[in-house]
């Protein structure tokens, strides 16, 4: 028989009780995590979001409560009253926060039973993720996921407190906006009132936060949901959360200083990790030169070494021809990996090919010198020069790629991360931040045969590069900056264009006609003509940040109700079909599948 609360009030959470509570009368409420019948006495681990208390049903203390305990099973919901007591000698559990006490039950209410579970919640058995997502309400009862989400809440509170203390105003921007598909696809929402017209869910609040600066709010922030209809990965979701900020009358240094303080506050108070300020900085060009990528993981070495000048006149035509044809040759020294087998090197070669490399040359450093199929093509002087460049020692493994600069950097940059993971060089307890600055403003899109914005069309060029936007676009650097943590971009921002004529020029460079630019962004262009202050901002990906703080493998482990890699919610069965009446009201007719 199911009981009602009947006016009972919880006095403590299950994880709160300690030795200092011994002798107190308490009321606990929660779920049965485990039940053990010891021939008369029944022991139940009662769990809530705060932890577990062991409660004891003794028929001599309360026969009615003991009778109820005989019928309970895992995940039944109970409310109990009892007395906190010290555990008997020899039964103290130092692994539990409440391990020195137990609660002797005097009354019990069975608030709800539970069906047999589709999987256990103890974490000892691997469960298919789709099953976990289907029964997300059960999965969320597990300690790890609950603690992840509680910590996420703390980070959000710290963010609001810090930004408010620094003069930021929390403002909301619309979710139903105009579609301006320049990057990922928009999620579209049909308008019932204006048939044939659509809203778009925002990919970011970019334009609205800039307009708030035009409006004179000076400093804005928002912890906001954003939406992108794109193919998903372990660290991507169709809906995601940003810590979004914008500031007026500032330059890059002002933004970086304030946001470094935010990261230091979050990591100190939420993670117990001190962030050394100021955070290291590196230009985009330096990052590409040293690490092959613009989001380098600085927890380990494996830096890239360019060898083009050394090999351009060598007898190894593969390298020489690439360099003389406008390409480059780079390599890396994998310290202590000289014993790697040929199969392992072949596997690395196949990995590099994923990113465009045609092959991977290698050298094993032995007591006799180079052991490699390519050794015979180089003079002793060339070998000595490369050894010095690599700081090569006996037992090392040298890896080389020769190709166009983009292919070389992409393949070796990704290979560097792959090797670090394979060799255990990425300590999860180390957090290395770096600001990447001075990005290119524009990049040539070979497929579309036009220039594209590296960040977004509202990023301002460096003052000294503005003169080259039309004449030499590839030369222009952006007032953009990314914050990278352990090889993950966790935030990106820029100083914005605040002059209408410069913004119109940028749209022109991106291949937008004046009419098209006005159609998509006319409200921004109009606003820029009414006294817009210099302004800039940044957005941090809260989901990815929490994934790194908690050491999770996927952002799905730090989001309460995530989607699958097919964009589905298995629990609620979204997306789903809608009935014909709804479609008729919207003026929509579905094409045949």
Curated annotation (Swiss-Prot):
Entry keywords, A to Z: Aminoacyl-tRNA synthetase, ATP-binding, Cytoplasm, Ligase, Nucleotide-binding, Protein biosynthesis
Residues holding ATP: 228-230, 237, 489, 541-544
Annotated positions for site Important for tRNA non-discrimination: 38, 90
Enzyme Commission number(s) of this protein: 6.1.1.23
Pfam families from the UniProt entry: GAD, tRNA-synt_2, tRNA_anti-codon
Catalytic activity line of the entry: tRNA(Asx) + L-aspartate + ATP = L-aspartyl-tRNA(Asx) + AMP + diphosphate
Root EC class: ligase
Subcellular location: Cytoplasm
InterPro entries listed in its UniProt record: Aa-tRNA-synt_II (IPR004364), aa-tRNA-synth_II (IPR006195), aa-tRNA-synth_II/BPL/LPL (IPR045864), Asp-tRNA-ligase_1 (IPR004524), Asp-tRNA-ligase_1_N (IPR047089), Asp/Asn-tRNA-synth_IIb (IPR002312), AspRS_core (IPR047090), GAD-like_sf (IPR004115)
The keyword Glycoprotein belongs to this UniProt entry's keyword annotation: no
GO cellular component: cytoplasm
UniProt-annotated binding residues for L-aspartate: 182, 228, 455, 496
Family matches, as PROSITE patterns: AA_TRNA_LIGASE_II
Subunit (UniProt): Homodimer.
Name by which UniProt lists this protein: Aspartate--tRNA(Asp/Asn) ligase
